[in-house]
Amino acid sequence: MAETDSFLHLARPLGPMAVGSAPTTAPLNVVIHPQALFSILDHSLRRNADQERVIGTLLGTRSEDGTEVEIRTTFAVGHTETTDQVEVDMEYQKQMLALHLKANPKEVLVGWYATSSELNTFSALIQNFYSGQGDGTFPHPAVHLTVSTEPGKDVETRAYISAPVGVTAERAADSAAFIPVPYEIRYGETEKSGLESIAAARDVESRAANIFTDIEALERAVEEVLGMIDRVSKYVESVIDEEAPASTALGQFLLNALALAPKVEPADIERDFNNHIQDVLVVSYLANTIRTQMELSNRLATAQLTLGGESGNAESGQRGGQRGGKGGRGGQQRTQDRSGEEARA
């Protein structure tokens, strides 16, 4: 989904803004985390049938120089939109923002998102609110992230900042020039494994996928590497045989990749690989052993509680019977005393 287009930034406010009140429009790079995209897509799936798009707030971190913004989390904001007006629940947005910032003090407000690629007057109104002073991102620009969620089409993502425009101050309040900025979707190895597991269920009718074990994941990774090596070998052979056009950039990339390969003997590589396999097997065995012990411990604890409850009820019944027996003996003794008194009388 990431784009590699070039961008030209014109950092000049065009509206009648007071000195020191215009947000900066310096070039920046936007980094999007997968969990933020999943949250946006989930919000889009849960929208009302009559809503064309939904909006929400973007939270993340900003570099010290302000040239890079990381979008880490999001939350939905309710709004209603008609042909001539838009209403946004700003009070809810402020309360949710305060709660999120209290739970994650390192994160800040970085912008807002919409599940539509369209940029209109309402988009400018919302953008000016998020980039304004006080509750907005001022003096930093607010990032507007658009995620296209049309059924049957690929998910398209765009990132923008804005510059104020307008002949008068009244027109500048509901106007903005959206400037596209470069972005990238950044994820780690753990997130990549999760994304691959989710993508595996894309073509399954039940939308369910099995979670691979460590050995299966390693096997899949080795197969992917072998497949890539095979494709590169075929491409190099076709270039040598003049069956495919040569690419200087691709050749330089392959040369740099080969230069990163460690200069070791094949026997050493095989030994290290086997040692790694043994480590993975040991970790898998220990994990399964711990899981079995936990299940056994839970079952023993449940059985002990069950047996303890039954024995407790039995002891209570016996104690009650003993108290009843004592009461019976007391009654018999009092009857005998009364009989003796009557005989003396």
Swiss-Prot record:
Pfam families: JAB, MitMem_reg. PROSITE patterns: MPN. The keyword tRNA processing does not apply. Residues 318-331 have a biased composition (Gly residues). Its main location: cytoplasm. Residues 308-345 are annotated as: Disordered. Residues 335-345 have a biased composition (Basic and acidic residues). One of its GO terms (molecular function) is translation initiation factor activity. Keywords: Cytoplasm, Initiation factor, Protein biosynthesis. SMART domains: JAB_MPN. Residues 30-166 form the MPN domain. It comes from the Eukaryota. Coiled coil: none annotated. GO terms for cellular component: eukaryotic 43S preinitiation complex; eukaryotic 48S preinitiation complex; eukaryotic translation initiation factor 3 complex, eIF3e; eukaryotic translation initiation factor 3 complex, eIF3m. Gene3D superfamilies: Cytidine Deaminase, domain 2. The keyword Cytoplasm applies. GO terms for biological process: formation of cytoplasmic translation initiation complex. It is found in: Cytoplasm. Component of the eukaryotic translation initiation factor 3 (eIF-3) complex. Component of the eukaryotic translation initiation factor 3 (eIF-3) complex, which is involved in protein synthesis of a specialized repertoire of mRNAs and, together with other initiation factors, stimulates binding of mRNA and methionyl-tRNAi to the 40S ribosome. The eIF-3 complex specifically targets and initiates translation of a subset of mRNAs involved in cell proliferation. Belongs to the eIF-3 subunit F family. This is Eukaryotic translation initiation factor 3 subunit F.
